[in-house]
């Protein structure tokens, strides 16, 4: 897929000014140049063009807010002076896997005053004697070269990754905000359903209590009936016994 089509797909119905992060890795550039990218991407902060066949960055538009630029695994051998004019606020630049052979090629990066991290892995320039020491002298604004500072301390989470995660967090917060708005809209209906369920539960409990009360009353009535029957039976036995005694008394008198 060529770069223009890829950019169109990545827009996903957004306008260029809405885009903060643009990843074009592994697409194809025309004649080794950037194409389809315009200065309408004025809010762009992160651009990745890994392995797209670039030989030059001359067609890069003016991107004042661009902070991180991924250009690794291309065929760039010079022309980096363009970056200072087009991306003046760049803080992270990855040129790993390009055809950069000497320090003079990266010297124009001195004008990128905000440049904090530079990666040149797998470039011939890294084979030069005192490579790291000389690059830090040439570009005093640098904090990290190939992921390590002057004291050979590793950048925390590759510093650049932390920046990209920050962009992702912003997107997540926006998505969460949309979900919360949706939940608020749906809340009244849900509340009605919950109230209805609570009313049904209360009615069910009341009916159960009435059933239990009715059963208890029936048991009491049955018990009362049994007691009455026993009393009647005892009373009848008493009368019968009395009659027998009276009859015995009359016989004795005779």
Swiss-Prot record:
PTM text: Phosphorylated on serine residues.
Main location: nucleus
Ranges for region Disordered: 166-254
Any GO BP annotation: nucleocytoplasmic transport
GO cellular component annotations of the record: cytoplasm; endoplasmic reticulum; nucleus; perinuclear region of cytoplasm
LRR repeats: 16-40, 43-64, 65-87, 89-110
Domain LRRCT: 123-161
UniProt cross-references to Pfam families, sorted A to Z: LRR_9 (PF14580)
Recorded superkingdom: Eukaryota
InterPro entries according to UniProt: AN32, Leu-rich_rpt, LRR_dom_sf, U2A'_phosphoprotein32A_C
Molecular function, one GO term: histone binding
UniProt-listed SUPFAM superfamilies: L domain-like
Keywords noted in UniProt: Cytoplasm, Endoplasmic reticulum, Leucine-rich repeat, Nucleus, Phosphoprotein, Repeat
Role this protein plays: Implicated in a number of cellular processes, including proliferation, differentiation, caspase-dependent and caspase-independent apoptosis, suppression of transformation (tumor suppressor), inhibition of protein phosphatase 2A, regulation of mRNA trafficking and stability, and inhibition of acetyltransferases as part of the INHAT (inhibitor of histone acetyltransferases) complex.
Homology family: Belongs to the ANP32 family.
PANTHER family: ACIDIC LEUCINE-RICH NUCLEAR PHOSPHOPROTEIN 32, ACIDIC LEUCINE-RICH NUCLEAR PHOSPHOPROTEIN 32 FAMILY MEMBER A
Name of the protein described by the UniProt record: Acidic leucine-rich nuclear phosphoprotein 32 family member A
Organism: Danio rerio
